[in-house]
Each structure stands twice: as structure tokens, then as C-alpha cells.
């Protein structure tokens, strides 16, 4: 959707990993050592799940979609906001009731006491990106099977829980910022960037396997390499600078769509826009702004010069007219007055952002923001949320209407009896809109087609294929 709020959901269930592995490895040898897996939360957590599942398969374990058939269940949790914590605890409860042997990992795992208080019978608890610890615990309770690793047929890219034509590429862990509404640094630690060579190796394998779109994710993507102290890495026999602009430039040469998510508004974001104008990476900028009132931004410990942000948006659009800007905002932050909220609405009117997500402030356990000002009532938060949504829906409809009559590349995600469903450069999977191509039932997921946009609303586009020559 173009304008959305947080709706907690399981990213993957017991069923998804099993089907993914079955499709990738139909000739795998049955070992009898079966693991169930539930993954919750954001794309960064999904990447962690993929890594754990890959190593489990390398070690010879099967992944099952049945609690009854599993020797043990792993639940990879989310702990970002209270709704996510509740969902994670519910998933652990279900796994305990249906199976009884459960290992908990992920962000909520960093709060072991909180989990033990509710579910004292879980076998083991680890924090986020504790891959080795998770596998060690699995080996303890379900002995590593004897098997020939060459019969597992694990793809070179590892296990992926996304469709074959797109994949998330995580470039770092942790975050050095200390936003008062966020507890991620306490869960995942400070910034820890992956070596550039390792990232580019993974990206190359993904593209060679048929991935058409690489979605770059981390807690703070634009900070990539700040912790490297200016040191270069090597890839393909050549030195590579370890900063987000250099990394994006290299990724853009690989022949796939490259989409950047979670860009903190640092000054050097300006350097990414020419790469978008040149077509090296998608002209799509996911840049969470959170608010527009200088007073609230200061309380959030976020950049507070809204005038500079508006100037930057204008400058970016002059350099790259096709630029699509996605952002997220929080309404009902502690101490937010009606005047503060009106400043936010005025900012939306002037900025004319393309894609916007809205969150009603949630009291995250351990967040500094809970104690810095008077909490806003649920009634006021709900009212401001709906006013925000109503305004942004009008803006989104206006921004999408500019595509009508244009011919765009559309990446097909799904095909049903009514036609094909895809996305343009303006649409990230799951969070943005879709492009509906009615009647085109012969297309297949992963195809890239040229289509003329015929209609739009505040969320989605409709199109007709104009070029029968497709690429897959």
C-alpha cells in the first residue's frame, strides 16, 4: 500500500521454509532429523532466518511444515514495538503447545528474562544474529545427522524465503544512532558493516541465480562503512571503497534492479542521487523522516532542520525527476501538540512524498521516549493518524497519476486467472503499491515487461503490455 500502518504478521510460517526447500532440493536425502521454523518481523530478520536455514540444510537437517513432525521448532522473533513483542510471544506459545521443544532467537531474544517470565519452558534463547549459538543449541537437542552434503543440493545463494526473482541483501548490523523511540541498538548493537567484497560476492551469486531485484537493507543503510575508518576492501581483484555510494555504484553494474532501503538523512545521501539519474540504481529513496516539527525531532534525537530537508528533496528531484521518495512518520509522539502535528501536515503538503507509512506511537519497553514527556491519549493518536492518512492519500493519488500514459518496465510478481501483478521501479515488495496487468495470464513471475500505464488510484497502477519481448 502507499499509505500504511504497522500490522504485525508472520513473515514466514512453518510452511514457507519447507516449501522453499522442497522446490530447491527435490532430490535431497531424508535424514529423519526435522526442524520447524517460524520467522517474524522485518526483512533484516528474514535474512537472518535464511542464513540459519541454509546452515541447517548444509548440516543435513530437514525443514518441516508440521509441528507434529518436527523434532524441534525455532522461532525467530521481532521485538521492535510492543505489538511485535506480543506477536512473537504468541508464536512461541503456539510452538510450545503444538510441539514442546522450542528455541527462541531474534531481537526479542535479547530480552531473555521477559521471555522466560511468560514461557519458562523454552529450551534455549539467543539474541539477534546469533547464528552459531542457534546451531549449537540445535545440535545439542537434535544431534547433527550423518549425511553426504553433496546430496543436499543447497543453492549457491543459500536458502531464500523470497520469490526467486528478488532478494534482500543485508549490508550491516546494528546502528550508531540513538533515536529515543527506538531500542534496536540495545538489541542489535552498534554499526557493524560487512566487508564490501563479501557483499558484492553475494550480490553476484544472486544475479547469476536469476535474481532480478536486489533490495539493500540494514538498520542504517546510508551509514554503511562508517565503522571501517576509510579502509578499502577488495573484490574481483580490485580495491573497493567501503561507503554506501561506492557500494551502490558497484551493485548497479551487475544488471539487476538495486533498491535502497532505510536511508538515514545524512548529507552524503546527495551523492546517491546521480547514480539514480544515470540508471545505475533505481530512483527510489526510502528515507524515514519520522516527523517535521523541530521540537519533536529534537526530542526524538533526529535531524531537525526541516527547511534543509525540503531543500534537499527539491534538489534531488531536479537532478532525478523520476525519483520516488518513501518515508515513515510517527504521530502521537509523547509531548506532540496540535501545533506540532500541524507542522507535520504542512510538511507533507509541501514535500509531496510518493510513498508514506504512518505509525501511531507505541510505548516500546525500554525506549527513552516513554519518559521524556506526557504520553498522548489513544483518542488523540487515532484522530491524528486518520487526518494524516487522509491528506497523504490525496498526495499519493496525485503523485501516481503522473505515470498514466507512460511506458514503464514492470517486474512480474504473480499471475492469477485475472492477469499479472507486478511492480515498477516505484514499488518495493510488500510495502508499496502494485501494477495490475489484466488479461495477461501467460506471463510468469520474474519476467520483466514493458507496459503502458492506463489508470491509477492512491495506491496502485493499471497497465497494458506494449512489448511482447519479455526478459526473465
Swiss-Prot record:
**CDD domains (alphabetical):** Radical_SAM (cd01335)
Which of this chain's residues are annotated to bind [4Fe-4S] cluster 1? 42, 78, 107
Q: Which cofactor does it need?
A: [4Fe-4S] cluster
Quote the InterPro entries the UniProt record gives.
Answer: Elp3/MiaA/NifB-like_rSAM, Methylthiotransferase, Methylthiotransferase_CS, Methylthiotransferase_N, Methylthiotransferase_N_sf, NA-bd_OB-fold, Ribosomal_uS12_MeSTrfase_RimO, rSAM
Q: Which residues form the MTTase N-terminal domain?
A: 33-143
The EC number of this protein is 2.8.4.4
Provide the catalytic activity annotation: L-aspartate(89)-[ribosomal protein uS12]-hydrogen + (sulfur carrier)-SH + AH2 + 2 S-adenosyl-L-methionine = 3-methylsulfanyl-L-aspartate(89)-[ribosomal protein uS12]-hydrogen + (sulfur carrier)-H + 5'-deoxyadenosine + L-methionine + A + S-adenosyl-L-homocysteine + 2 H(+)
Q: Name one Pfam family in it.
A: Radical_SAM
Domain TRAM, by residue range, is 401-467
Gene3D superfamilies from the xrefs? Methylthiotransferase, N-terminal domain (3.40.50.12160), Nucleic acid-binding proteins (2.40.50.140), tm_1862 like domain (3.80.30.20)
Cite the GO molecular-function annotations of the record. Answer: 4 iron, 4 sulfur cluster binding; aspartic acid methylthiotransferase activity; metal ion binding; protein methylthiotransferase activity
User: What protein is this chain from?
Assistant: Ribosomal protein uS12 methylthiotransferase RimO
Record gene name: rimO
